[in-house]
């Protein structure tokens, strides 16, 4: 039975008093920051470029207030997440969100004033006369890089007005898909009739009973088939918004606009898709192996997620902590001390309680600990989640300790590398420690499935996303028929399973929320691949390799993303890191195939 919040031992909860010792102090700080923001328009707007001194002063003031806003927000957000039923912290969350909006509105003048009125020559002279501006040089350099794509204040204001309209395709999808659409009733493994939901679909697809999987799969996609024209319209409109925004800002494409916003060259995307295409035979081999293990001659898409091992790993939290510390010790003393601090100083909210937010995350702000939320159940997945979130938290801690606030964060493009590197090292460690063939079989299957779902599947999404934006930009209509055909062909190309014999999968595009995120998913694939490459260097490389990795963790956003990850020895415009990742996939697939030949799966 799930406990109430007050029944959880204090040692297993996060210590948010290190942010604000009392709620009253949070409320006092909130009012103070609101007052500071109320003065911005009067004191700063229109004066940013009066002189080098005003540029420096207003920039420092903006960053100082931003730092305070983030601290207020994370306290409210985490208080709310620990028990979402508490009205007080729901109110705190609303107030903190409103403060974020207020901050954005107050400093809306900053970029347009900077880019419209400041020439690089003038800025260069100011740098010579006021050395302190150099502390923000990379931030200003990023702004100058946007210059040809920035809108005037008047244009920006006009386009800000229909902002809610531009959000409506994704919001309509979300409401329709999560609230309005009701899936049919199906039978579970016990033969009980249950209503199919997004929440239970995953567990039904992992059922050992093939009839249960088939029924859930067909029931789910019958709904998407029935509503395909509505989903096509929301997706088409969303793509049009992306293409429109790119066009008016003088980008060549929506993809260029999305990637350049994070200073990621388009070549990274192209190298990924090219590398994936070259190694699709490996995925086809893995599918054939699943087919052999499950003894299914007419293998279908609903057989993809069936666990190949029923080995039940169990870890209590104390064992999980010990294992995480052992595994992450490979990074050296500096990293290990931070991991120890995370456990000793209560950075982690461990157990599930009534009203607690589901899932897991790493959070915090520049001025706080890098807190983590878990919902520990003692499974192998929970151990992987622990080291994953620890990867984010130690990345954040290194960044915040080594960079000023202006560079004290990092883009999602870099974030997933630090977390999945830890997952890869955990896999390597568990495999190294295990001589039991059934254990090795389970671990290899776990990693190969993660690779398939993160690298191959997300790349399939990325390829689909690129194609639909290109087709819309050429003036073609994204009808449901076109989307079905494109997705079915891609799925056959990736998995080697006939589109004709798997007709339901052509509707999968309709259920993927990431297609509304604007060229986001490719980062999962690049991140996992880079992490596989780095983990191999850390485990089998030199002390220098490990130090280079720490240098990447410490860099934050003090340089462009590709320059930061290059510190860890990864060139993401080259196929080398992908080749290394696929080589590891093949190595582990080879071992799994040999174990199957020996009958270990039986």
From Swiss-Prot:
Zn(2+) binds at residues 388, 392, 395. Keywords: Hydrolase, Metal-binding, Metalloprotease, Protease, Zinc. GO terms for molecular function: metal ion binding; metalloendopeptidase activity. It comes from the Bacteria. Coiled coil: none annotated. The active site is at residue 389. Its EC number is 3.4.24.-. GO terms for biological process: peptide metabolic process; proteolysis. Its cofactor is Zn(2+). Binds 1 zinc ion. The keyword Methyltransferase does not apply. Hydrolyzes peptides containing between 7 and 17 amino acids with a rather wide specificity. Belongs to the peptidase M3B family. This is Oligoendopeptidase F, chromosomal. It comes from Lactococcus lactis subsp. cremoris.
